[in-house]
Amino acid sequence: PNRPTPACKMPDGVDYVEMSPTKVFLIQLLNIAGLGPVFGPILGALYGPIALLWVVIGCVFAGAVHDYFSGMLSVRYNGKSVPDIVGYNLGDLIKKLMRVFAVVLLILVGVVFVAGPAGLLSQLTGMHSMLFVAIIFAYYFLATILPVDKIIGRVYPFFAVLLVFMAVGLLGALAFKGYTFYSNIEWTMHSPSGLPAWPLVFITIACGACSGFHATQSPLMARCINNEKHGRKIFYGAMIAEGVIGLIWVTL
């Protein structure tokens, strides 16, 4: 707890900005959650109760552990990203390969996180989806070039609270409105269309159980925590919270 964090020993007012543990937790939750623990569990529910089992086991023993270690490794390496940490230990060639892999992964995830909300907003408003694509890209640009506490630090906590509120509301509906789920429990190893649960359930439900993409996000908040003792609550805890959200959506 007495070891200075990157935000304390090398603040730059841009990426390395000290923020409160609660705010960092909420930002981390929204960073790793988004659409992932919604779409993935809904699709994974086709495999039946095995989806619930995977979310619980995967989240507790794999996903949360992965997020904690990726975040704390970044803290110990002065807020470095995964390619830099890998390169420090395995050499420059592996660093370059990891950087290419991370860029490709981020492009793929970015496309989903642009097309998904834009399509949904287009359906709700009747406006052209490209308008929302342009708005989302404009936000991406501003959030990238401005200090982390100017947009991300102010907007993300609000939307993270909304995400939690939505999940709690759905849980309340399940608990108090008499809805049933998996009333006729049948443990199968395939979906209704015949797709095998192994290995498809593990890649269908990634966010909410275990996602390597989170390793690209954890360093963002590793640069903002003010004490290493908060690492478990922020990195491990945010993944557990995402798992709970995923469980709620699986039951729907």
Spans of model-derived segments:
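Membrane-interface "cap" regions at the ends of multi-pass membrane proteins
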Residues: P1-V38, N227-H230
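Membrane-interface alpha-helices at helix entry/exit sites of multi-pass transporters
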Residues: Y16-V17, P49-V56, D84, Y88-V100, ...
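Extracellular loop-to-transmembrane helix junctions
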Residues: G44-S74, P83, I94
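Structural signature of hydrophobic alpha-helical transmembrane segments
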Residues: V56-I57, Q123-F137, P199-C207
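Selective recognition of specific alpha-helical transmembrane segments in multi-pass small-molecule
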Residues: A102, L106-G110, A160-K177, K229-L252
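Hydrophobic alpha-helical segments and their helix-loop junctions in multi-pass secondary transporters
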Residues: G110, V114, A118-I135, A143-T144, ...
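Hydrophobic, small-residue-rich membrane helices and short re-entrant helix-turn-helix hairpins
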Residues: L146-A160, F213-L247
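Helix-loop-helix junctions that connect adjacent transmembrane segments
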Residues: P157-A160, M166-A215
